[in-house]
Amino acid sequence: MLGVLAIIGVLSVGAIAGYSKAMMKYKLNKQAEGLTMLLANCIPLSKQLPAVNEWKIYTGILPKLNLLPDSISIIRSNEMKDILGIESYFYHTSGENEWGIFYYVPESSFGKEICYNLIKTVKEFHADMYYIFRSKNRTDTYHGMGT
């Protein structure tokens, strides 16, 4: 009897782990889909933004222009959150067509997969993006990579 319960317990743990991994894969796909749509919407917008002297955050105008995909929501006036809970903002800088999306990717068990997913998705738009920035939180120094 205990052997049967032990086998059921092991199978249950395996099923839960498999379900968790499958759900994360689903969310990563949804994140990539949302980011692709967001970038496709932001590229034309970025070319219409006025010149600025410093960084300027434009996240707040995205919902007003109906440019946010369903999987991304505004959480503060200048920040958005995707299906994985990753916070980000859309910005424009002083250079011509220099814009981007800054991501806060916290350390987590799936942090590496999330970063890989973001970079893989953004690579499709490399001709229109200047930098990719990422930070663990608001107090961490940012890490960027030019295209």
Model-identified regions with their sequence ranges:
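Detector for methionine-enriched segments
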Residues: 1, 23-24, 37, 80, ...
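N-terminal alpha-helical signal peptides/signal-anchor transmembrane segments
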Residues: 19-22, 32-52
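Short, charged/polar micro-motifs that form catalytic or ligand-binding hotspots
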Residues: 25-28, 108
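Periplasmic/extracellular, small/polar-rich flexible segments of pilin-like filament-forming proteins
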Residues: 48-147
